[in-house]
Amino acid sequence: MSFPKYEASRLSSLPTTLDPAEYDISSETRKAQAERLAIRSRLKREYQLQYYDPSRRGVIEDPALVRWTYARSANIYPNFRPNTKTSLLGALFGIGPLVFWYYVFKTDRDRKEKLIQEGKLDRTFNISY
């Protein structure tokens, strides 16, 4: 029994399972895929040997996770590029809160001082005059 050749519809694209580029792979690509699979399976086997060890003590450290955590947290400067956006964000988050709290405390102090000078502020628990 022979199947007719698939022809793509005008209203839909060719399904990925019928894409010849998915199956017609060069020998270099197959070799690279096999090497990656061998590395993955070796690392998986090492992890499973450590995980299912009955005399295991402590935590199993995954070197890839340690590298990722180090790159995300402690090693930001090799990946940091100063530009206008980062400079403005640094000023906004570094100096902005200081300016905000200065404004809040200054206006509150000025308001209280004005009420004290007018004699309208109730200072019942004030220790010094």
Curated annotation (Swiss-Prot):
It holds the Pfam family NDUF_B4. The modification N-acetylserine is found at residue 2. One of its GO terms (cellular component) is mitochondrion. It comes from the Eukaryota. It is found in: Mitochondrion inner membrane. The chain crosses the membrane at residues 86-105. Keywords: Acetylation, Electron transport, Membrane, Mitochondrion, Mitochondrion inner membrane, Phosphoprotein, Respiratory chain, Transmembrane, Transmembrane helix, Transport. Signal peptide: none annotated. The modification Phosphoserine is found at residue 26. The keyword RNA-binding does not apply. Its main location: mitochondrion. The keyword Protein biosynthesis does not apply. It is a single-pass membrane protein. Complex I is composed of 45 different subunits. Belongs to the complex I NDUFB4 subunit family. Accessory subunit of the mitochondrial membrane respiratory chain NADH dehydrogenase (Complex I), that is believed not to be involved in catalysis. Complex I functions in the transfer of electrons from NADH to the respiratory chain. The immediate electron acceptor for the enzyme is believed to be ubiquinone. This is NADH dehydrogenase [ubiquinone] 1 beta subcomplex subunit 4.
